[in-house]
Design a protein with these regions (language model features):
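A structural boundary/capping signal
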Residues: 1-132
Length: 132
């Protein structure tokens, strides 16, 4: 885990077009991209059932954020929040919710909790709201 400044988080999120941003903590730590990829494999191994309108994209994103909370505390996170959060976007003219993670390499990644896909967030979607 690497300490990252609020300024860096704001700069990275604003650069991809996020205007509605909620940061809940005063200090943040970023996991590595390798951790994020392993986390995706962990979630895929514990996959929950997709139920339209009941357990769909927004519930998957909340579940992933909760699991990230637990995993990062187990990995040694103390005295800071982390940079894995829930994100709303427009993708293919449809609303979608997934996760964004600013990693220790200072790259912002989109994380699809339903598949574990990790991809750079820039150009991935039209981002509307983020909560970290």
């Amino acid at each position: 885990l690497k300490a990252v400044s609020l300024e860096l988080i704001y700069t990275k999120l604003r650069a991809i077009g996020v205007r509605d941003l909620v940061l809940m903590d005063s200090a943040y730590a970023a996991p590595s991209r390798e951790w994020l990829v392993e986390f995706g494999s962990y979630l895929a191994g514990n996959k929950l059932e997709f139920i339209p309108e009941t357990f769909d994209c927004e519930q998957f994103a909340r579940w992933a954020a909760h699991e990230a909370d637990l995993a990062l505390v187990k990995a040694g996170l103390r005295d800071a929040g982390h940079t894995f959060g829930e994100a709303s976007c427009l993708q293919d003219r449809s609303a979608h919710v997934l996760n964004l993670c600013l990693c220790s390499d200072e790259i912002l990644y989109a994380f699809e909790p339903q598949t574990g896909l990790v991809t750079p967030a820039d150009g991935f979607a039209v981002w509307t709201r983020v909560r970290m």
